[in-house]
């Protein structure tokens, strides 16, 4: 089977199955034979599609960031950059929850090497650009746009990771996303009342995950003995 005749369905099955093995069992459990067996193909198919396991693992990361980038790119740019920041955060959350194995595998396979140094920069750049629009609108402190974007990314990534590990429930995470964004964005200069109005506008847009529970406090989290999904 030549690269030209390679089946894209098999390629995606290899990527998603490899991501599941890495995410649920660890990188050490991913082998050529096991992957080929679970997908129902030959080990040669892995070489046909990826050239080997090293490139397959790189493609998992690239595919994960490609899906994240597409999800974020679908977020409309409006006249309210703070609302846009909130919707970008929810888009990140939804992408991770809908692609849990791929998302976890993206960050479990060690540091990004020089060959993939640019992977993920586009998705982070979308966040930085939106923060810069907030600065341009006069609502955010102009001192450190990259710093705010980094802290927002860390907030969302950390909460998503806790949910995927079943240490926090979806409702707890969704409430903390809003509270954490409020705390960070107002700390970087936004007026709390203006943020509240932006959050309301963002809530009216379709990307927001529903929150059914009241916001969770540190006492609630400490008192929860286990996740109840």
Residue ranges: model-predicted function:
Residues 62-85, 117-121, 130-132:
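Amphipathic alpha-helical linker/stalk segments
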């Amino acid at each position: 089977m030549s690269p030209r005749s390679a089946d894209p369905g098999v390629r995606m099955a290899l990527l998603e199955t490899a991501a599941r093995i890495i995410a649920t069992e660890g990188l050490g459990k991913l082998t050529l034979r096991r992957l080929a067996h679970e997908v129902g193909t030959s080990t040669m198919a892995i070489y046909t599609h990826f050239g080997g396991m090293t490139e397959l693992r790189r493609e998992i990361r690239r595919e994960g960031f490609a899906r994240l980038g597409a999800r974020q790119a679908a977020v409309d740019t409006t006249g309210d950059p703070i609302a846009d920041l909130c919707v970008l955060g929810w888009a990140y959350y939804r992408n991770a929850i809908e692609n849990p194995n791929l998302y976890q595998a993206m960050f479990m396979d060690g540091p990004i090497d020089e060959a993939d140094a640019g992977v993920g920069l586009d998705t982070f750049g979308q966040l930085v650009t939106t923060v810069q629009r907030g600065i341009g609108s006069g609502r955010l402190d102009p001192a450190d746009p990259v710093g705010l974007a980094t802290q927002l990314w860390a907030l969302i990534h950390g909460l998503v990771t806790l949910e995927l590990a079943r240490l926090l429930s979806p409702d707890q995470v969704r409430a903390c996303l809003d509270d954490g964004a409020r705390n960070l964005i107002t700390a970087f200069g936004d007026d709390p009342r203006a943020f509240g109005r932006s959050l309301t506008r963002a809530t009216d847009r379709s990307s927001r995950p529903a929150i059914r529970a009241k916001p969770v406090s540190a006492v609630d989290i400490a008192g929860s003995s286990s996740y109840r999904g």
